[in-house]
């Protein structure tokens, strides 16, 4: 018997969509979730909070293990361009990565599983700060899970390129490890007519960007792969003034932790070499936080794939590796488990101001996930 209806899920998702909040500031989101969870009161259901995160524990009748489900809750600093009756009420902020879907499905699955006391324990994690602060790592390092730490952990991420009704994953690495790169070069400014009296940081920075691309082409095993992308470059104040300072920011994406460490090391070496070559100062800040590769544990994932492949309502696809970053990789480095894609058929990509996932995926997601988690309780 299903306890969740599509209309209920759509209403919840639309309310959440209107109140996006960035990492560790999700106070209204947390209050909304706690109110919904309070409606599910059961003597075997316990709730804890950690900053803006929520942990819900369903105590089993005869627990042999604890099974975890994670949904991230933060939004993005993006001005929404989708015009609707439920568009974001917060200027400059949007649920452009589908975390409103993740929360709604998480609530739906929690409602389904909490109707009757299961045999095993279940932990539902509504996790803050996936996008900016690696909230999963922060919670783990702060011992937020305590005795509720799962023996297996599962999570999904919406995928705009897959049709509704599709689930996709793979054994092993699914998503990349990421690392933020911030570099500042400082030389000597001057008049454009007298370059010999100055030390041009535009020239130094462009050389650094070009040399950084040799990491991928000449240092990293081509079979393993990596991406080094600089997304911002700021220098100078006028067309006839040689820039004294240049700042760069970018990202490293790799499919293994080892390659990420190698790439970080080469970024530092190249930056120091540029500083010596151009006789300038350089500051390099590399911040990986908890964005480790998402590695799906073989036994958990094989079981998940076998289950989903047998469901008549599910179109299962083998997923290719993606350079997407996800802090669930940190939790999977501590607890075995699986992450997977859920198709939501949006014409626009994740992090797009026009991202508009199909709400028909909500009930499908609740039914598919609930069925799978219940199968683990047998």
Swiss-Prot record:
Task: List its EC numbers.
Answer: 3.5.1.47
Q: One Pfam family for this entry, by name?
A: Peptidase_M20
Give GO MF terms, alphabetically: N-acetyldiaminopimelate deacetylase activity
Where does the sequence pass through the membrane?
none
| EC class name | hydrolase
**What reaction is this protein's catalytic activity?**
N-acetyl-(2S,6S)-2,6-diaminopimelate + H2O = (2S,6S)-2,6-diaminopimelate + acetate
InterPro entries assigned: AcetylDAP_deacetylase (IPR023905), Amidohydrolase (IPR017439), Bact_exopeptidase_dim_dom (IPR036264), Peptidase_M20 (IPR002933), Peptidase_M20_dimer (IPR011650)
What keywords would UniProt list here? Amino-acid biosynthesis, Diaminopimelate biosynthesis, Hydrolase, Lysine biosynthesis
Pathways involved: Amino-acid biosynthesis; L-lysine biosynthesis via DAP pathway; LL-2,6-diaminopimelate from (S)-tetrahydrodipicolinate (acetylase route): step 3/3
Top-level taxon of origin: Bacteria
The answer to whether UniProt assigns keyword Amino-acid biosynthesis to this entry is: yes
Q: Which GO terms describe its biological process?
A: diaminopimelate biosynthetic process; lysine biosynthetic process via diaminopimelate
Active-site residues annotated for this sequence: 72, 131
Sequence similarity = Belongs to the peptidase M20A family. N-acetyldiaminopimelate deacetylase subfamily.
Q: What does this protein do?
A: Catalyzes the conversion of N-acetyl-diaminopimelate to diaminopimelate and acetate.
Protein name stated in the entry: N-acetyldiaminopimelate deacetylase
Please name the source species.
Answer: Enterococcus faecalis (strain ATCC 700802 / V583)
Q: Which lineage?
A: Bacteria, Bacillati, Bacillota, Bacilli, Lactobacillales
